[in-house]
Amino acid sequence: MGMKALLPSLLGASAALLFTASFAHAAPPIPDSLKTGGFEVGCQAWTFHDFTLFEAIEKTAEVGAPTIEFIPNQKLSPEEPTVQFSHNSPKEVWDKVKAKLAEKHVTPVAYGVVGFSKDEAEARKIFEFAKYFGLQTINTEAVDAIDTFEPLVKEYDIKVGFHDHPKRPDHPEYRMWDPEYILSVVKDRDPRIGSCADTGHWVRSGLKPVDCIRILKGHIVSSHMKDLNVPLPSGHDVPWGQGVSDVKGILDEYKAQGFEGPISIEYEYNWGKNVPDAKLCMDFRRAYGK
């Protein structure tokens, strides 16, 4: 075969290799066993932050959610209320948590919102913690540490999502609420660095979640899902589908973009007695998938 005839084959092979290489570090697909209504949905432990982590795991199982997102520094258990759980805890504490998760058939998938140090050794502790528990995503607001943790994202193949809290009129320098700002931070970074889309905080900031999700298309790596009673900073959580956040529209847009999770139910109302409300959120998700 002459060089002219061979050239298209070589170019095709090179393109195939490049295509393969571009997906070489893609996160593995979410197991069907962790999906509800086509999405991976679980509870954010903050929903039960008035309780210990062991109790939060029990309540997550009671809700019928297969997954949980850890928060840093939650008290471990009723038996050990002075022990805190985080990436800085000794391994024996991690082992106890892993055993409790197995007992309740709950899978940890994310951790946050957690701060990142610019010190590589300190940042690595968070990734080692995530690796131990098999987490998919770490959620943070530490934009200033992105140069520190981006190499660790590549090394560990673990995603990092930038979380948004509401707009702060008294702190105009806070920009995490703005999806355009988040996009500017992540668009030229490793694709495993993206947005942890908190839909409720967007509503509290006067934004429509579906519009925000479209702005961040292809750059959402996790989500904290909320439906609020009113589109105001004072708005509080209601079961999905009963508020103003357009949860169906959010799920439709996630589905259109191919985003399957992790999605965390973060219910910040009826503290101490919100398991029934969280169950209704799971029911909405199941009905959506039918």
Predicted segments with their positions:
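N-terminal secretory signal peptides that target proteins for export/translocation
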Residues: M1-L6
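Bacterial N-terminal signal peptides
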Residues: S9-S22
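Histidine-acidic metal/acid-base catalytic patches
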Residues: H25-A45, H49-T67, L183-A197, V203-K290
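Active-site acidic/histidine proton-transfer and metal-coordination neighborhood
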Residues: H25-P28, W94-D95, K100-A197, V203-L207, ...
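Active-site-adjacent substrate/metal-binding segments within catalytic domains
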Residues: E69-E79, P108-V109, V113-S117
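Glycine-rich, proline-tolerant flexible connector loops at the mouths of alpha/beta enzymes
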Residues: F70-K96
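A short acidic, helix-capping loop that chelates divalent metal ions and anchors anionic groups
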Residues: L76-V83, R168-P172, R204, P231-H236
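Alpha-helix N-cap and loop-to-helix initiation/capping positions
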Residues: Q84-V93, K118, K125, E173-Y181, ...
